Amino acid sequence: MGINNLNILDIENNEDINTKFLSTHLEKFSSNCKIYTGDFYLDSFNYFPITKDNFSFLDIFSWKEKSEYNHFFTKKFYSNFEKNKKNAKVFNDLIVLGTSPGDNYFRNLLTFIPRILFIPDKKINLAIHRNSSNKLREFIKNVLHDRGIELKKFVYLDDNFYKFENSKIPQFLSQRICVQILNKVFKKNHKNKNKIYLTRKNADYRKIINESDLIDEFESKNFQIIDLETLSIDKQIDVFSSAEIIVSPTSSSLANIVFCNEGTKVFEIKPKYQYPYENNLKSRYSFLCSLLGCKYYSMEADPVKIDNIDEMTKKYIDKNVINQSNYYKNLLVKKDDFIKFIN
C-alpha cells in the first residue's frame, strides 16, 4: 500500500479518474489546463493533491523539481497520512489556487497567478495561503473581476494538511507557458521608454549598503529611482512595461521582467553564489530574459552580513542556507566597476 502516482497515459486509460478532470483552453496561447474536481487532500506548502483513493498526479501537479516530491511515495509518509487524514480540517466547494506560504513574489507570479486564467466558474470561493499580502489579494481580485468571475470570498490556508470536498485545483503549468501568458495578457502598451533603478532600501536582504554612492550616477543618466514595495502590482506592471533599461539588485520583484518588451535591457546586481543549491537563483532572471528577447547583463557585489533575520525567512528557509548563502546578506558595490557595468 502507498500513494500511487498516475501519469497522463494512466489517467486517460482510467475512465473513473479521467472523468474527474476538466480541461480548459486558452486559444490565444494554444494552452490547455487540466483541473481536478472532487475530493482530495493536500498540504499548503506543496499543493500536491492526493485523492481519497490514494492517487496522485505528479505530471500535472508538480511545480518544483520532481525529486522534491519523492517523500510522498515513502512508507513513512503513507503511514502518517493514513494516521492523520481523519483529523484534517475539511473545506467544501472551493477552488484551490494556493499562494506561496512565504509570500514570495516570484513564486506567486510565475507559478500560481497564471492558473487563474483557466478557471471556468463564474462564482467562486478561492483558497490561498494566509501569508499572502494584501497587495497580492487585491491583484487576484482585479484579475478575477476582469475575467467576469465573482469572488464570493477568500478562504485562508495555514501551514497544515487539509481535505477538500467537491472542490477543484488547476494544474501547474510550465514556466515557459506562464511567462508567455503573463506577458501577453498583462503587459501594457506604453510609448514612454524609461530608465529605471529599483532600490531595495526597505528590504530585509540584498540592500546595496553604499547605494548613495550610486545615486548621482543614476541621476546624471536620467534614471527614475523606484521602490516597488510602495507600488501595487498593477503599478509595477506599468513600470516594467514602460522600461527601456532596468537596473536592480537581485530581487523577487525582477519577476516583473515578464511584463517587459522585447529588447529591454536588464542589469542585475547579484550576490556571489557559491553552492549548487543556488543554481536556480543564479540563472533565474537571465532565463526569463532569454524567453522574452530581453538583453541581460549581470555583475557581482560583495556580501555584507546581516545580524537580524526576519521571522518569515527563519520559518521557511533552512538555517544552514541562511548562514551560508550570500542571498541572505546585503551587498556592497564597487563604484568603478558599477560605472563600467551600466555603461
Predicted segments, located by residue:
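The feature primarily captures lumenal catalytic ectodomains
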Residues: 1-343
